[in-house]
Amino acid sequence: MSLQSYDKDIYDLVNLELKRQCDHLEMIASENFTYPEVMEVMGSILTNKYAEGYPGKRYYGGCEFVDEIEQIAIDRCKELFGCEFANVQPNSGSQANQGVYGALLNPGDKILGMDLSHGGHLTHGAKVSSSGKMYESFFYGVELDGRINYDRVMDIAKIVKPKMIVCGASAYTREIEFKKFREIADAVGAILFADVAHIAGLVVAGEHQNPFPHCDVVSSTTHKTLRGPRGGIIMTNNEEYAKKINSSIFPGIQGGPLVHVIAAKAVGFKHNLSPEWKIYAKQVKANAKKLGKVLISRGFDLVSGGTDNHLILMSFLNRDFSGKDADIALGNAGITVNKNTVPGETRSPFITSGIRVGSPALTARGMKEAEFELIANKIADVLSDINNASLQEKIKGELKELAHKFIIYDKATF
């Protein structure tokens, strides 16, 4: 029986979401469009199989084929990042990070991560996260120019003397200099942990420096710029760390892994290893740069003055509207972004003074610099007359026409 005939409520909502994805311009930096073959294997019979443990060391029988699947995913992941060990079982980036902490830290140990309000992530020690409750967390941030001051990070590290330094961000527009973080970690005897969830797709294409060999441990999601299924991974070159990480994931915080998602990760990694991937990643950066350049020319402020990666941060500190206002107005015009705090923030995290705008999803649809120039001008038009509802409706229609020239899916399920 089909989903449509068995559960029309869910079927209809899934197809409404398909329409939204096709009609709107998805510019949330952490979102992307995965491949049909990735979704196909996620919807396969692999979802039926329990496989507690690791390849060759399972607690259930009948794992001979899923062992091979997981090993393929592991091998492809190692090839992608140029590392010796990989765990492909984490169900999310947050669980991957939790697994790293559980493996290498004791409760109460000090960690030094990027401040959430400056572009870090909840799992880098934010007080509302388990990472900020189980461990004593300290923070570095960016200067008013939106860039990390590595000398300042060194000063903080020497005062704090953390057991672990976390580098990586969810809203940082410049290249992360892992070598400088290595020097800081060595100066204070800290473990260096990189969370590259946002930039992984650029890293594996050579469009951003690789955290290896500088970092002791690296985590990532497999969606975002990698365009795979939703999930997490952990990599290292340290065999002792690898064993501890494996134990921290299973049986530490997870039971049976999601075999259908691990298979989907393997399929995604095959895409990431293809020659076409480098073309995609290069275009992601080019599109983000074009977006930023046009917005600056239209008089808008960008944190750090531009971008080295897949996203820009627009700052409205000098405007009479908020990030939330911009988020809503652009949404009404058919452009999906997210409100975001910015350096020197004066508003609450629920209101903010900025928005985060990314290029990966529209690049996946086939859009290039010409389309991003047009879109940037439409963003500027909306924000220059932010209360003009009729203008928003007009632009929504224009952008829907553009979106329909770059349809990526013709159905909702695979």
Curated annotation (Swiss-Prot):
Give the signal sequence positions: none
Instruction: Kindly give the HAMAP family that the UniProt entry links to this protein.
Output: SHMT
Question: What pathway does this protein act in?
Answer: One-carbon metabolism; tetrahydrofolate interconversion; Amino-acid biosynthesis; glycine biosynthesis; glycine from L-serine: step 1/1
> Which residues does this entry mark as bearing N6-(pyridoxal phosphate)lysine?
K224
Q: What is the reaction catalyzed?
A: (6R)-5,10-methylene-5,6,7,8-tetrahydrofolate + glycine + H2O = (6S)-5,6,7,8-tetrahydrofolate + L-serine
Name of this protein = Serine hydroxymethyltransferase
Q: Where (6S)-5,6,7,8-tetrahydrofolate is bound, by residue?
A: L116, G120, H121, L122, E240, S348, P349, F350
Q: Is Coiled coil included in the keywords of this UniProt record? A: no
Q: Which InterPro entries match?
A: PyrdxlP-dep_Trfase, PyrdxlP-dep_Trfase_major, PyrdxlP-dep_Trfase_small, Ser_HO-MeTrfase, Ser_HO-MeTrfase-like, Ser_HO-MeTrfase_PLP_BS, SHMT-like_dom
Annotated site residues (Plays an important role in substrate specificity) in this chain: H223
Q: Name one GO cellular component term.
A: cytosol
Keywords (alphabetical) are: Amino-acid biosynthesis, Cytoplasm, One-carbon metabolism, Pyridoxal phosphate, Transferase
What EC number is given for this enzyme? 2.1.2.1
Q: Which organism is it from?
A: Campylobacter concisus (strain 13826)
Which CDD domains does this chain map to?
A: SHMT
Q: Which cofactor does it need?
A: pyridoxal 5'-phosphate
Q: How does it assemble?
A: Homodimer.
Give its localization: Cytoplasm
Give the record's family classification: Belongs to the SHMT family.
GO function terms (MF aspect): glycine hydroxymethyltransferase activity; pyridoxal phosphate binding
A GO biological process this protein is involved in? tetrahydrofolate interconversion
Alphabetized NCBIfam families for the sequence: PRK00011.1
Q: Any idea what job this protein has?
A: Catalyzes the reversible interconversion of serine and glycine with tetrahydrofolate (THF) serving as the one-carbon carrier. This reaction serves as the major source of one-carbon groups required for the biosynthesis of purines, thymidylate, methionine, and other important biomolecules. Also exhibits THF-independent aldolase activity toward beta-hydroxyamino acids, producing glycine and aldehydes, via a retro-aldol mechanism.
Pfam families documented for this protein: SHMT
